[in-house]
Amino acid sequence: MTYNRTIHFSDTDAAGVVYFAAFLSICHEAYENSLQVAGIDLKTFFTSSDIAIPIVHADIDFYQPLFCGDRIQINLTPTQLNETEFEIKYQVFNENNLDKLIAKATTKHVSINPKIRQRTSLSLSITQWLRSNQDDC
């Protein structure tokens, strides 16, 4: 799954490069977009009282700076780890050079019952989303 985006001024820090926390937000945008493309209603997904899917780990590696106005392509690859967890790997390229990796990130997600804060199986819609995106890879 790919997601294309322009780096905005609000994504940058005082040095004029993308701020690391803003980059995680951009990755989350790509994740949300992939859910929406798969037919998952985002409002229902993020406000469900039965299941929550928090991010429990995130990491980023930058290989060159990103500036306001840069056009990027994010390739995301979700992988189910077990019945309650999945991770998403993000690879970021400049749209003008898709051969050179600019940055990479990983987010790990865990399905929980928000009422009792215990792990629960991934929902059918997320399992289907994971399978459909793994078939693309």
Swiss-Prot record:
EC number: 3.1.2.28
Reaction catalysed by this enzyme: 1,4-dihydroxy-2-naphthoyl-CoA + H2O = 1,4-dihydroxy-2-naphthoate + CoA + H(+)
Catalytic residues in the record: D13
GO molecular-function term, one example from the UniProt record: fatty acyl-CoA hydrolase activity
Pathways involved: Cofactor biosynthesis; phylloquinone biosynthesis; Quinol/quinone metabolism; 1,4-dihydroxy-2-naphthoate biosynthesis; 1,4-dihydroxy-2-naphthoate from chorismate: step 7/7
Highest taxon, organism lineage: Bacteria
Record key words, sorted: Hydrolase
Top-rank EC class of the record's enzyme: hydrolase
Single GO BP term: phylloquinone biosynthetic process
Pfam families, per database record: 4HBT_2
Biological role stated in the UniProt entry: Catalyzes the hydrolysis of 1,4-dihydroxy-2-naphthoyl-CoA (DHNA-CoA) to 1,4-dihydroxy-2-naphthoate (DHNA), a reaction involved in phylloquinone (vitamin K1) biosynthesis.
Family as reported in the entry's similarity comment: Belongs to the 4-hydroxybenzoyl-CoA thioesterase family. DHNA-CoA hydrolase subfamily.
UniProt name for this protein: 1,4-dihydroxy-2-naphthoyl-CoA hydrolase
Organism: Crocosphaera subtropica (strain ATCC 51142 / BH68) (Cyanothece sp. (strain ATCC 51142))
